[in-house]
């Protein structure tokens, strides 16, 4: 197989499978009540939607008889351990930094009393028939942060692998002959548009914002570009998909904490979540640093170090 040119046939087949399976799951969610009302929403999201890229990867290899080399599933911890750590810790830092930027620009939406946490505790107590626990809302935030940092990346690993085994372990290597920077652009666009049906149903941003759902889809595409650049970089440097799985799982585990600090009705397309246009600025700066670094997105090992350097030089000249 010629690894110096894009295998567009396999790219197209993969995209058809990844979008087709996921969007069918989204249709099932929509027809059974939407994200908020469907009794099957969680199952369809985790299995049908998030699992679609991994299934697309497997189906594409089967249909095209590609074989099972270069799966990116080996952990390669000795080679890539720094990128495991970065991918594990950085999402929490990006999230809180993004919240700080958003609330500094829109202080009227910041609630230092964390009344949203107290409301959550009261609703939970009412649903279970128990007394409202006497807990500081800040203790809940600290506990949630520690859980997101230490446990969420592991708990989320299996469903997140459903995405990353498709995006970072298959599509990204297929597009790398375009050059590292262009690969990240196309990965962001494809990954963002893949989310379109659930964004149109209110995922991440709700629907109470100007330009819904199109502005939300655009914001999500921006977020998948900057997040995808970070995850793609970690994958390439580690030579394994697992740092991307850990990083993506950490993002999913911590992103919702921004809602604890909200009062009023901010435009969620802007923030304070890391998926917002303003909330994503810290990770966007990290992505910019990666994109501006000449060797950050170099091609992974092919047959030898010399082959890597030869192909990378050709694609960045």
Predicted regions mapped to residue ranges:
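Membrane-helix interface linkers and caps
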Residues: 2, 30-36, 42-92, 101-123, ...
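Hydrophobic alpha-helical membrane-insertion segments
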Residues: 85-109, 187-190, 232-237, 241-248
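Membrane-interface interhelical connector segments
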Residues: 125-130, 199-212
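Hydrophobic alpha-helical transmembrane segments
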Residues: 126-156, 217-227, 280
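Membrane-interface helix/loop boundary segments of multi-pass membrane proteins
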Residues: 160-193, 232, 236-240
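Alpha-helical transmembrane segments
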Residues: 10-23, 86-94
